[in-house]
């Protein structure tokens, strides 16, 4: 309970953002999850004029959490659902990561990224995690690029090639 209280005190007059909040309750209460939620619910009441709490996470799991505690549910005034990114938006995020890290993609790699992100969206799998999926793809790309460069006399150390781009199966285990 003290950790929750300390965290709330740090967030007073601001926002407490709880990512993957549903992990406090996975259908069964853990001692920590139940105590944390009870403490947080009380703090939300005690500091209602000084604290905004955002519970973020997958919609269904977050609804379970909120519905598991009537006191919590009654203190949540607004609910927002954000749509998943499109394949084109995911591809733009990927390219931004590439550029921010000082790399370039050749044309074939860019086309492969567009295709990969479109394929991922078509899976309709909310567990892909949007930005997390892109980050995972980018990290695999960099690992593959490093392996390609290490095994050759390549002098271009900043261009991502088609062979560096992971396939969907590598990222999801699905075909």
Regions found by a protein language model. Name each.
Residues 1-12:
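Short glycine-rich substrate-engagement loop in P-loop NTPases that contacts/grips substrate
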Residues 2, 34-38, 74, 92, ...:
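Surface-exposed alpha-helical interface segments used for non-catalytic interactions
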Residues 15:
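Hydrophobic "anchor" residues on beta-strands that sit immediately upstream
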Residues 18-19:
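Hydrophobic residues in beta-strands of the RecA-like P-loop NTPase core, especially within AAA+ ATPase
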Residues 22-60, 67-73:
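Conserved catalytic/switch belt of AAA+ P-loop NTPases
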Residues 66-84:
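A short helix-turn-beta junction within AAA+ P-loop NTPase domains corresponding to the substrate/partner-engaging
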Residues 80, 84-86, 94-156:
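Conserved AAA+ ATPase small/helical "lid" subdomain
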Residues 144-175:
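C-terminal engagement/docking regions of AAA+ P-loop ATPases
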């Amino acid at each position: 309970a003290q950790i929750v209280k300390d965290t709330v005190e740090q967030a007073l007059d601001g926002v407490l953002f709880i990512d993957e909040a549903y992990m406090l309750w996975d259908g069964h209460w853990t001692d920590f999850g139940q105590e944390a939620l009870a403490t947080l619910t009380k703090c939300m009441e005690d500091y209602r004029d000084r604290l905004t709490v955002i519970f973020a996470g997958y919609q269904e799991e977050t609804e379970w959490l909120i519905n598991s505690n009537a006191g919590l549910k009654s203190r949540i005034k607004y609910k927002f659902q954000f749509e998943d990114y499109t394949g084109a938006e995911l591809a733009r995020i990927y390219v931004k990561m590439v550029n921010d890290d000082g790399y370039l993609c050749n044309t074939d790699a860019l086309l492969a990224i567009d295709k990969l992100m479109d394929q991922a969206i078509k899976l309709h799998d909310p567990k892909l995690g949007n930005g997390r999926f892109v980050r995972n793809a980018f990290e695999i790309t960099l690992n593959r690029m490093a392996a390609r460069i290490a095994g050759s006399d390549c002098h271009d150390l900043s261009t991502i090639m088609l062979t560096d781009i992971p396939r969907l199966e590598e990222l999801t285990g699905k075909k």
